[in-house]
Amino acid sequence: MSTSSEPYLEPLRLFLNKECIWRKTGKGAKHREYRCLSSSSPWSILPHQAARRVWKYEINIIIVKKRNDDYIISMAIEGLHYQQILCPKVLTQLFFILHSHGGTKFYKLTFDPFKPMNAELAVPLYDTTPLPHMTMQGLSVYDHCSVVGKPICAQVAGSITQIGTCGVWAVTTGAQTNIVCFALRYDLAVCISDPKVFPSMARCMASAVGCAQETCSYCTGHNKHVEVFDVNGDYGKNKELCFCSTPCGDWDFRDESMKPLFSKNDDMVGIRVREPPNSENTIFSKASAYFYGITRDGKEVDLSDENFILLKIDPRLSHMIIVACPILKRMCMIKS
């Protein structure tokens, strides 16, 4: 039960705790400053939220060390001062290190229930200096994955949420969520894929049987993502790392060069989704449990299981991918 006396403070606190990953942008003897960029929240977090649609939040926070046993939290949204609030405790946790950019550190901040300030101090000067764009190469995602060689059962792993129809799931155990997906074997990915793109089966299918129109929000993803590792900037597409794309249309091959990845049968003209397995609470480790090929005369063709492996992505990277996408947020995150 929240002890916040203002009705909007608790939704805001939950948003900061669950949907924001921060970079430290400044520090002094008595303060720390952090910045984050998060996609649109599934829940209203600001009093004006119902009045207009907000697709991303760029937030600056200055945490001033204790005054009368409370921290003072100064907050700016989109570069404009929003308000100051009190918080009895703030936990700072090193969450992720992006080694490809000099070991840049990302933090998770956990705030105890907020309290309103009766009188604000002077508005601070927030650091809104643009920071360089950061990203992770798609092939580097493999460094944060483990291969799954046997079925994952909800009774053991926790709840399972299917994401789209292309072999992607969110597996939640307690407060931890892992993205589980089929992806190309690493040796194949190194040889044939764009190194910027993580070659999940969802991405490969979108390339193979999708419409190839850059404006298609199904095949190339919607344009409301924020960048996974940026803490400033605008929203746009993220077909390199996100898992929200799924092919539109009839799933017949439009890129014939992709066909050998899915089957050795030259007569295959498309991919189809099987009827759901008997156990929806189990993720099977073979792609052929979910998909099959089809020939021009309607005959079923087995897919080549050896080219795709089932991977479990590290929960911290999974979380960063989820909070960068409003669709994944709605599917994978539970309102507290």
From Swiss-Prot:
**Keyword Transport included in the entry's annotation:** no
One matching Pfam family? Herpes_UL16
Keywords, comma-separated and alphabetical: Host cytoplasm, Host nucleus, Late protein, Virion, Virion tegument
Which GO CC terms are listed, alphabetically?
host cell cytoplasm; host cell nucleus; viral tegument
Q: InterPro entries of this UniProt entry? A: Herpes_UL16/UL94
Subcellular location(s) per record: Virion tegument; Host cytoplasm; Host nucleus
Q: What function does the entry list? A: Plays a critical role in cytoplasmic virus egress. Participates in the final step of tegumentation and envelope acquisition within the host cytoplasm by directly interacting with the capsid. Upon virion binding to target cell, a signaling cascade is triggered to disrupt the interaction with the capsid, thereby preparing capsid uncoating.
Q: How does it assemble?
A: Interacts with cytoplasmic envelopment protein 3 and with the capsid.
Similarity-based family:
Belongs to the herpesviridae cytoplasmic envelopment protein 2 family.
Instruction: Please state what the protein is called.
Output: Cytoplasmic envelopment protein 2
